[in-house]
């Protein structure tokens, strides 16, 4: 069943495999009249791209091309087609994986579902698919910027290390998108240890949105938080999502968790900017739990396509963690959810 | 924007307010030929209904009526309309709340979004809306039972108390749907303390599904886990969702979190039955963090509709926790997600 | 597959069978703040209801009840549930049809699709289903009236008789909704002849909408005319749809068919108010071809459920033509299409 | 609002403007395991391509590239991205049209809707957009061929000339896709007259589908005929759609129009293969009325973007009629509708 589209009014459809000729996205429903150039998108793609020290050495340039929907530098209201051609494709690295199921990956589930799979670098299930999401998110960002909405994602935990302080300016200064410089330094040391050990790690990404008006979200199934949860959980390595106080709220008392209302607004934001599925006007705050990358060089038990036991040690170009590359992806998903809701009119009739 | 429908093939649309004449659901896409009687639905409604000691004393009978889609005791493939008339409606209890915004509720966000709100018992944002979900879930259960799929929800944490053991048979023996009798007894004591204190609490609900075939879920946005996350987060009091190891996975190493594959299947289930968004054939395991019920008699700071500060102490019939009533609701949402995916054919062409 | 919903923003879901307990519709996405009373809906239902001389003698009162979405006389933005209980249900009339397939009806296709069918009066495939559409259309009409849009349907051909003149005031003065009094009188004589002959007839319904702004319709698949065509063709007896000059345009020259543009607007309206799928601001004009009612007392050849040949003469309460009852139904479908598009914001960004 | 997607299970999204860098389509939901090569698609594209004598002299090669969804020559179940780069783009031809609204085109409605338009060759509203539909239809054809379904479109009327005979083999032998060789010859003469006169013409296209099983179509809004009507009316120049006897049925008696049922099946096919919105198993027959191409060199009255009157004579490369190029497009739309319904399982539960 078709599952590669997201959004109702600001609607995207992504396509492409890790080692196919190209990948891309069609954005349908973007309003006309928004200035848009490839550089607007390229900037965001650079933030998730491999080639940095932390991430895999695949030197993919990730040049985006705009194939439709923009005329004389401005969106026209028709579908915007973005494409990124895959240039550094070395499928040869993967031929030995054609007949083995990597633990923690979708190799076996894809084969069970489709009866066939593209085993080159994970095919459609590769993290590379998220480049298309980031490209679409960049377009959503342009639209939202014009409405005063700003979205920022950052790392709040990595390999069990947590941030202790929050400095917004620090986020783009370190390779972890971490708002705490001290924590970032510790994370860097942790990466080296894990690389030496042939192992990998996960972490927690937080996304916050400023400037959203009250009133976004549609009861009862398309609540703002429901859509955010679905959006973030659709990102490959994400295994948990929470809004505001999240899982901590489960252990709080009502008198602790309720955000008091004052004539100046809410006195706290345990709600994470969402009440009854509708935005309150406070910052929207969501967090995503990211599992460790399953590709490790440490030996693992698995089976091959004939069902025989195999000991597998995955070589090749792999990251130690989906963080930091997943950070701009989480940001993109929140941008896309908000763009979708922001497109809807305030439907109140004048009386 | 329309937001009261859920699902693509097994599609439900709910309607109704807490203190309106009735509430209900239309189930469109349920296969024909399934025996269905009101009692099949009534049984599940009883599990979430008020009137038990733990929950609010509203003595609503919640009698479901089947108005369409069933002929001679069997579904016909046409829409099934279920309705529950509200009989014990005392809106008078709420008139004093018509001009005040209750903290932690949707009173203010609804008014900001719609410019008008039904203040009787929360109107559409009331937990009562979930009766329609449970009714629809009961129909999904009938369909899934014929395919060998079984879904069960239970409480794993309540007011900071956690279960230590798991006994499936115990779940329906205590009012908390708790699989640990000792923990259930402690929870019961906690309820009394909170009621005396005029406060409320939350908890964590786990849902597990047995018997699902591998192959459910549609990459990349309609992944099984993405749909589960959106479904559970759409339930009123839920602020977090996790699959399998969930947030714990964020602090694990790849070598710990990966589920090894053996000739006999997966050796563990940190994935919670989902890899790359597609079911593995293992039990599907999801958890939802439930916030404390915001209606408490303990005094709170808030404002009225004129923006003036008010100290509010909420009287009337209110539960101490959304647990246990939310347990069958979480179960229903997972049933509905699975019914939707189970309706889709295995689309593989013979070669 | 679920197929009983229509519209994207102003979204309706209908349910109910001819001889079940009730039928109804859920309207999701209707803006808040619109005054709405049962009489607003009842008025439209009266226009399609049986009991008039022309139509079948089933004396169904068709009383609509509003079960949700309206508070203190005004829509709240939440789903509006409308129900009409079936009171004059004499299924006994149909028991002899349980084992025979009526020509021109859906008896056999429903059974082939679903493996089961509700044979009482056509079940879900009965024209009675359209009462729910008319009820929903009445709500759309209230919304559109506030935006200055007015929709009117009328009969332009009946049993081969065509209207020669157009008098808008005449439409509601004769039982055919015919804008030509002379033609209406001829139609009345034709009905008597056909009733005597035990036969039935069809005709053509035209729907025109005044006051629509330019800009409605979404290229390339959700064009305004594409949605109108799908909407009208979804009405049971409709076998053809055309916009503006329609089929006549197929035999015209470009120089004849093009509507010249002048500083005062379009000089003609062969386009029927739609160019490139987008409304022009001129009247929107659509026509639907209605086939003769298949239930006739004249003997017909058919087969029973065992495949044996049967000569069938259908007795009971049946209309001679779907006209006039189908006229308000076509009107409702156009109302629903326009409400859906009118809900969408003009998305142009200010530059 | 997003409007460039079509279908629910076999879902396509098209993009691209007449004179942009490229146009294309993403096909999401195509089953895995279907052999697919560029030539399978190229063959259908050739049938609609310009360059033949009848059509405009734009020598576009229309080479399709498959960018995703196919691995080792076989579909994988993931989205199939097809792209056609525009090579023969002479926008200069259109600069004089940047400030004038061509009658019968979408120039003015696009500008009214979006506030901006791509005036190069009609931009998104150009007939060139349909190349993407034909490419997607070719993939649907591959899928349907495996299920025994065959779809064929042909011209039954052109400039007021009608076919008198039907010879299936003749269809691909003449440039009109006309099943009557004598009529085709007359059409050819008519084209020359119109070209000399600087005028254009329309016609009627019929599409028939063989081999469809009974049971396709979803009551009550997604009826097979409703979807066909919406699909065909979404094609640029189409102004009318009919199924089976269509508009002629409006003047028939019930006793004439009903298709008698015999032990060997239906004795006639006035229904066009659809009863109550569900396929009967007979050939599905639909017709589309095609308006004359609005671009004519004969002088026309119009206005420019400043609202001033202009006499316009359109030069450049234009067809005399949308026929024959629209014939493969109508065929593609029916292929896409049928593929969508054929993907759905027969949902009957065994009892």
From Swiss-Prot, chains A, B, C, D:
Cofactor: FMNH2
Keyword tags: Amino-acid biosynthesis, Aromatic amino acid biosynthesis, FAD, Flavoprotein, FMN, Lyase, NADP
Annotated residues for binding of NADP(+): 48, 53
CDD domains: Chorismate_synthase (cd07304)
Stretches the record annotates as Disordered: 39-60
Pathway annotation: Metabolic intermediate biosynthesis; chorismate biosynthesis; chorismate from D-erythrose 4-phosphate and phosphoenolpyruvate: step 7/7
SUPFAM superfamilies: Chorismate synthase, AroC
Biological process (GO), any one: aromatic amino acid family biosynthetic process
Annotated GO MF terms: chorismate synthase activity; FMN binding
GO cellular component, one term: cytosol
Cofactor binding note from Swiss-Prot or TrEMBL: Reduced FMN (FMNH(2)).
InterPro entries: Chorismate_synth, Chorismate_synth_AroC_sf, Chorismate_synthase_CS
Enzyme Commission number(s) from the entry: 4.2.3.5
Binding site for FMN: 124-126, 276, 291-295, 317
Tagged with keyword Amino-acid biosynthesis: yes
Catalytic activity from the UniProt record: 5-O-(1-carboxyvinyl)-3-phosphoshikimate = chorismate + phosphate
Free-text function comment from the UniProt entry: This reaction introduces a second double bond into the aromatic ring system.
Record PANTHER family: CHORISMATE SYNTHASE
Oligomer and partners: Homotetramer.
Family the UniProt entry places it in: Belongs to the chorismate synthase family.
Protein name per the record: Chorismate synthase
Organism classification: Bacteria, Pseudomonadati, Thermodesulfobacteriota, Syntrophobacteria, Syntrophobacterales
